[in-house]
């Protein structure tokens, strides 16, 4: 009864005294009374021509006003909109069969009932309750479900970010492998070019297949994320509405929300499977290289005093030796770093030699100008007469140049290395005989002096130069 009385009072406040209906676009005049904008304008236009007055009296209190002083009453307009919304909700919450207001709820069927539905046989034996009694319980259920959906949404958002990271990481890994494959083929003979295209084609297909999987996972997660957002908006609307609105079809709503389970992300390892195993392809190239193979013997007159040469000058080992001052004074001998040169000198043509490094963890090898500096401040770079590569446990395999270069990639640690020199072409190249792959070629040089094989030996890392007839 009190609620009905309040509604009457609110309607009276929000009604226009001219048209007697709820105000539309309410405006206030000087005295503070409010009217429909169209009503007060019509009133002014009807009365003013008859009297000739620019100022007219308020229809309620006769206080003077003019159209110039009309002010939109936003607060009243907001109240009117709220009343209309409440009335619309109340209209929706009426039993279509009996045209009575819903005020009961059937727990078994999950349906709203009017007082006439309440007494029907179809609900006999069911758990029936007043709307007010079950409202709070179901509101809490909806809110709990909304919390779970938000957690699901947050989880999927994290997974979307993870998938995006996976895509970028996958692209980087593929690009890294692509560069490795390209470098393997860079300086090989022209007949290998078609094979290079084939391997890159396989890699592209592998990349596309994995990206399709990753992007598909990303799209599925995005769809789930958006569905969760829609469910959250629906639940928010229910929780903000009336009790009847909240309970209407509530079990179906909860069932749909519960059906959205969190799917664990399957994070497969991002491993590029395409490998360029050029062992068979490289067989013909090795045959060509070995046409130019020479048997290298180490020159004892150049060996640092801490190096021991054995097996006919083919094995060199780092070993602390007694100092021979006369031997140390030799201009040919390295006295700074533990290095040694091969006996052979190259002034023209092509040469290829192999070095066994299977028992060594660190080494420097290649070719150098015969008269390079032998002291401590030796810079192993082309500008100083060195064309060498270096292996170390800390930095891996790298080319020794005046400017830093990225580490050289190897499929596996080489047991035997091949060094190829084309004097006229100004080329020095390195190959892994173990895997049959190209490692590195220095930029073209212009050789003028005699070149010789160069080796720097480290502790516990002996180097061996196999004879040609033993390979």
Curated annotation (Swiss-Prot):
Sequence ranges assigned to domain B30.2/SPRY in this UniProt record: 276-471
Result of altering residue 31 to S: Abolished E3 ubiquitin-protein activity and ability to ubiquitinate TICAM1. Abolished E3 SUMO-protein activity and ability to sumoylate CGAS
Functional description taken from the UniProt entry: E3 ubiquitin-protein and E3 SUMO-protein ligase that acts as a regulator of innate immunity. Acts as a negative regulator of type I interferon IFN-beta production by catalyzing 'Lys-48'-linked polyubiquitination of AZI2/NAP1, leading to its degradation. Mediates 'Lys-48'-linked polyubiquitination and proteasomal degradation of the critical TLR adapter TICAM1, inhibiting TLR3-mediated type I interferon signaling.
Binding-site residues for Zn(2+), renumbered to this chain: 95, 98, 117, 123
Catalytic activity entry: S-ubiquitinyl-[E2 ubiquitin-conjugating enzyme]-L-cysteine + [acceptor protein]-L-lysine = [E2 ubiquitin-conjugating enzyme]-L-cysteine + N(6)-ubiquitinyl-[acceptor protein]-L-lysine
InterPro entries: B30.2/SPRY, B30.2/SPRY_sf, Butyrophylin_SPRY, ConA-like_dom_sf, PRY, SPRY/PRY_TRIM38, SPRY_dom, TRIM/RBCC
Database matches in PROSITE patterns: B302_SPRY (PS50188), ZF_BBOX (PS50119), ZF_RING_1 (PS00518), ZF_RING_2 (PS50089)
Keywords (A to Z) from UniProt: Cytoplasm, Immunity, Innate immunity, Metal-binding, Transferase, Ubl conjugation pathway, Zinc, Zinc-finger
Subunit composition and interactions: Interacts (via B30.2/SPRY domain) with TAB2 and TAB3.
Entry protein name: E3 ubiquitin-protein ligase TRIM38
């Amino acid at each position: 009864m009190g609620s009905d009385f309040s509604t009457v009072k609110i309607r009276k406040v929000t009604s226009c005294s001219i048209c007697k209906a709820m105000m539309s676009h309410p405006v206030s005049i000087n005295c503070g009374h409010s009217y429909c904008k169209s009503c007060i304008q019509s009133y002014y236009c009807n009365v003013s021509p008859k009297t000739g007055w620019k100022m007219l009296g308020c229809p309620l209190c006769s206080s003077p006003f003019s159209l110039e002083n009309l002010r939109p009453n936003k607060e009243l307009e907001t109240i009117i909109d709220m009343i209309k919304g409440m009335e619309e909700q109340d209209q929706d919450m009426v039993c279509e069969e009996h045209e009575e207001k819903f005020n009961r709820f059937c727990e078994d069927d999950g349906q709203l009932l009017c007082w006439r539905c309440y007494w029907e046989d179809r609900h006999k034996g069911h758990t029936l309750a007043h709307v007010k009694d079950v409202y709070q319980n179901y509101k809490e259920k909806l809110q709990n479900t909304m919390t779970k959906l938000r957690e699901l949404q947050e989880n999927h958002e994290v997974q979307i970010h993870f998938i995006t990271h996976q895509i970028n990481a996958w692209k980087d890994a593929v690009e890294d492998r692509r560069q490795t494959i390209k470098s393997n083929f860079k300086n090989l003979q022209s007949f290998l070019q078609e094979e290079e295209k084939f391997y890159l084609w396989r890699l592209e297909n592998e990349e596309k297949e994995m990206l399709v999987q990753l992007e598909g996972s990303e799209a599925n997660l995005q769809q789930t994320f958006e569905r969760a957002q829609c469910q959250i908006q629906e639940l928010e609307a229910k929780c903000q509405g009336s009790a009847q609105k909240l309970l209407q079809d509530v079990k179906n709503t909860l069932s749909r929300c519960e059906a959205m389970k969190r799917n664990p992300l399957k994070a497969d390892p991002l491993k590029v499977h395409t490998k360029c195993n050029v062992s068979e392809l490289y067989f013909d190239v090795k045959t060509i290289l070995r046409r130019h193979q020479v048997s290298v013997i180490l020159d004892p007159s150049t060996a640092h005093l801490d190096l021991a040469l054995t097996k006919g000058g083919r094995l060199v080992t780092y070993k602390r030796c007694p100092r021979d001052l006369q031997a140390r004074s030799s201009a040919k001998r390295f006295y700074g770093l533990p290095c040694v040169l091969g006996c052979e000198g190259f002034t023209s043509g092509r040469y290829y030699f192999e070095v066994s490094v299977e028992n060594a963890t660190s080494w420097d090898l290649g070719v150098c100008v015969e008269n390079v500096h032998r002291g401590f401040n030796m810079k192993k770079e082309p500008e100083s007469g060195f064309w060498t590569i270096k292996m170390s446990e800390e930095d891996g395999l790298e080319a020794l140049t005046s400017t830093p270069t990225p580490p050289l990639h190897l499929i596996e640690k080489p047991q035997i290395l091949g060094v190829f020199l084309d004097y006229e072409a100004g080329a020095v190249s390195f190959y892994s005989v173990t895997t049959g792959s190209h490692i590195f070629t220095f930029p073209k040089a212009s050789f003028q002096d005699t070149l010789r094989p160069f080796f720097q030996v480290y502790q516990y890392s002996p180097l061996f130069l196999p004879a040609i007839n033993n390979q």
